[in-house]
Amino acid sequence: VHFSFQNIIFLLVAVAGFGLFAWQAQKIRANILVGRDRDMSGNVNERLWKTLLVAFGQQKMFKRLTPAFLHLIVYVGFIVINIEVIEILIDGIFGTHRVLGFMGPLYSALTGTNEVLGALVVLAVAAFWWRRNGSVVRRFTGPEMRAWPRMDANVILYIEVILMVALFTMNAADLKLHQLEGKALPGAFPISSLLTGLFPDSVTALHVLERVGWWAHIVGILLFLNYLPSSKHFHIIMAFPNVYFSRLMPQGKFSNVDSITHEVKAMMDPTYQVPTPPVSEGAEAAPTSFGAKDVNDLAWTNLLNAYSCTECGRCTSVCPANLTGKLLSPRKIIMDTRDRMEEKYNSPLIFNPNLYGKEAKHDPQEQLDKENHTLLRGYVTPEELWACTTCNACVEACPVNINPLESIIEMRRFLVLEESAAPNSLNVMFSNIENNGAPWAFSPSDRFNWADELYVTDKAGATA
């Protein structure tokens, strides 16, 4: 252990980096908790198993093999390379050098794997960049993917390349330095050993390059960590709790408003006793209004969805409404929810929805009238909501179990129950149900007229 001024500087930088991230994470947590309460406790084993398969195991990614393979490389590389980050943190605080070298063959296996994965990450990032900027992948386009979202996707790729370059610079310079000094460097460096020829033979220059690579790598990681809350890549953290708290009941089953359900049952059966505690999974506290007009009307799990979105567009690419030219984009619903939260409550350090991306969604006059903004109409139009066929294709496609349909249904409920603003076709159906007991405009007495020319002659008996 050797303490120096450099260790003090490192400790201050590390504390500032992690502290700033914790501050941003707390702001995001506060945003999520403005949502309505929803009981998602219980079924721990089932939830853990789903998290293991979907979040850790990337199960739903492999429906599209090419991006799944590329993403797997970056994902595994991210996990393994972070083992070296632990070593850098220990070295930076205590003044040691490659403190985990005592692990011998295991350390060599780790550093060798680290290097190979680092090279593969660079190749995968290049492929991702081409898919976003060189090829035409339809799901990477759309009005919601202009300005900040498009820039953010590329910034992340550039940061990942810079981090890998810093890593190889540190390792290659350190390896050549030890070779010149006739010393053995713990570990295996299959990629860096190929790069040593690019480095000078000066011991002083190699010392400088090794330190530059070391500092660039760890400071870059801390900067990346604090960029995450402003980026779609925050999903690398939020995907795990989002999958854990995702709904377990069948996708086709909607959660009714309990208070309305109990009222209807009590009207039909005077002996019906309204239960006090909610019993169904996902049951919410009694609402002050029906449905959702703004983000605070949605459940906290819906707001957690918004921070878990990868903006990959898989949901929109399978949406039948979007595919037939309707305005609805499930991805936009989720992105709008996040933007509205950060407009109304807490914004992260870098991204502020008041500054980026709004030209694709609002005219200048709307931007000046932010106090009157709500999620419904301010960001999401009724036309988008009523285009939804409630088919659950978006939910099935999402690799991190986001459920845009829940938010859509809640905003529809507000339109119908609070504003009586359902489309005319639905209003006709509601009137028919009220007057005729069926969605169709036929008298109940005429309900069996279709059977007149069939073998059924005793319609009274058929209805008995």
Tell where the protein language model's regions lie, with residue ranges.
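Membrane-embedded alpha-helical bundles of multi-pass integral membrane proteins
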Residues: 1-277, 335
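Iron-sulfur-cluster electron-transfer modules
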Residues: 2-130, 134, 297-300, 306, ...
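Short, highly charged low-complexity linear segments
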Residues: 136-143, 185, 282, 450-458
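Generic recognition of flexible, low-complexity loop/linker segments
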Residues: 152-153, 202, 208-213, 224-226, ...
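Short linear motifs at secondary-structure transitions and domain/linker junctions
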Residues: 202-204, 283-285, 441-445
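P-loop NTPase catalytic cores that bind/hydrolyze ATP
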Residues: 217-221, 231-236, 312-313, 388, ...
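Ferredoxin-type iron-sulfur electron-transfer modules and their immediate structural context
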Residues: 226, 230-385, 430-439
